[in-house]
Amino acid sequence: MKIIMLGAPGAGKGTQAKQIAAKYSIPHISTGDIFRANIKNGTELGKKAKTYMDQGALVPDELTCDLVMDRIQQDDCKNGFVLDGFPRTIPQAKALDDALTKIGEKMDYAIDVDVPDENIVNRMGGRRACLNCGATYHIVFNPTKVEGKCDACGADTVLRDDDKPETVQKRLAVYHEQTQPLIEYYDKQGILKSVDGTKPMDEVFSAIVGILGE
């Protein structure tokens, strides 16, 4: 079972991807993890990626796809995998499809965790992070016991720059321009499934399990 998770930043697709991976005993694969692992292990692909990342540049699609293909051809992916954070653009999706076709494979599902922009801004604007230990909270869904203080270490919690409304709006604009076209792309392939991401996390997961089967 080969699955791609789609959805805007803050839609909760990463959380759902982890739960899918645990339930179906398949790896949860994020591009960030792949980059870090290859750089840490000093692979040739990792060295190439690091030269771009050190300059603050985006890693080219072709190299990112090579890294992903290298990962999904490892033994633990024989029964499937969940891709989280890749592909992000139509060129990446086409590169992935082409690479999979060469090894006689194809994606089975593209699951879109659908959340309106307004909900995303409110959801991310409520996030708080501990300045000291990095623990994360939410003022509505997962508040600290003492307002503004971390439950774990007692240090101050703050709204990160990444979660400020103006930053979230910019990230959403990029998503709508670059990533949302993937919804139509996978719909045309007949593998797109959409779930209502505004519902509680366990209900969203139940809906996904309903699509994938027990």
Swiss-Prot record:
Keywords tagged on the record = ATP-binding, Cytoplasm, Kinase, Metal-binding, Nucleotide biosynthesis, Nucleotide-binding, Transferase, Zinc
Q: Which reaction does it catalyse?
A: AMP + ATP = 2 ADP
Keyword Kinase in the entry? The reply is yes
- Ranges for the region named LID are 126-163
Give Gene Ontology CC terms.
cytoplasm
Q: What is its EC number?
A: 2.7.4.3
The pathway it acts in is: Purine metabolism; AMP biosynthesis via salvage pathway; AMP from ADP: step 1/1
Q: Where is this region: NMP?
A: 30-59
Residues that, per the record, bind Zn(2+):
C130, C133, C150, C153
Q: Which InterPro entries match?
A: Adenyl_kin_sub, Adenylat/UMP-CMP_kin, Adenylat_kinase_CS, Adenylate_kinase_lid-dom, P-loop_NTPase
- Describe the subunit structure: Monomer.
Described by its record, this protein's role is as follows:
Catalyzes the reversible transfer of the terminal phosphate group between ATP and AMP. Plays an important role in cellular energy homeostasis and in adenine nucleotide metabolism.
- Domain remark in the UniProt entry: Consists of three domains, a large central CORE domain and two small peripheral domains, NMPbind and LID, which undergo movements during catalysis. The LID domain closes over the site of phosphoryl transfer upon ATP binding. Assembling and dissambling the active center during each catalytic cycle provides an effective means to prevent ATP hydrolysis. Some bacteria have evolved a zinc-coordinating structure that stabilizes the LID domain.
Protein name per UniProt: Adenylate kinase
Source organism of this protein record: Agathobacter rectalis (strain ATCC 33656 / DSM 3377 / JCM 17463 / KCTC 5835 / VPI 0990)
Q: Specify the taxonomic lineage.
A: Bacteria, Bacillati, Bacillota, Clostridia, Lachnospirales
